[in-house]
Amino acid sequence: MADRGIVAVFGSMNMDLSVACERIPRAGETVGGSGFITNAGGKGANQAVAAARMGACTHMIGAVGRDAFGASLVAGLQDAGVDCDFVVHRDDVETGTATIIRCEGDNRIVLSPGANHALAGEDVARALRRLVADELDSDASEIAPAAGSVFIAQGECDLAATAEALVCAHGLGFYTVFNPAPACELPAEAWPAVDLVCPNETECQVLTGILPTDDVSCIAALKALLDKGAGAAVITLGGAGSVTLGDDGELLRMPALSSTVVDTTAAGDTFIGALAAARLEGLPL
């Protein structure tokens, strides 16, 4: 039983396959490449690892194919301290992959979601109810039995399943965090089940039509997100940190820590996972 709540993540699990080349091949052409890399990825998996490394009791809900990539992803999550009892191994679909061609400082990506789209909302809801009964030692018929726990969802899985999962988690008492990445719009009826929405500036512009570049546009964008029905909103701004609204509607800025940037891959996912872990500690937004 988790003494101070859990973090449950419903999200994508991908194997990233990356290769560098001097130029992009034309149709029917083969060019030489180098620096082939395989990396575990997927926003859900990244966020789960971040939460676990921050000390949170973290559970992954998702699906992989019954293949080598799926086995490797699950093993990596477990090595990071993430419980994978609710990761389904599917025989009818392959593990999600991202194939990346790196060329002259740019890249081109082909994403194959595979098993990431295999779970329906009821599959996730069933896992959440099991977590409430088993890990939290509570009766799923109680009012808000998961109070004090956090549920995270993003936009890389089936959107209808994501919306249904958010509604279920909210009803069970989880503090729900929705990371609309890649940018995606929830059904209107699902927004009130979002306790915190956390896009970056580009995703925010897609959702609200407002690019947050200064105090005025940040306030307008945050209010537009709240008008959708979310309980709170945080916008991440890369090197400029993040912003939210205070209780009186004033803009609150949190600057990014000064550091030497080596690689920004999964920086946003790490932010979400760390935020969820901090929530378990009772820290205010």
Show the residue positions of the predicted features.
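Conserved beta-alpha-beta core of the PfkB/ribokinase-like small-molecule kinase fold
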Residues: 125, 132, 139, 149-220, ...
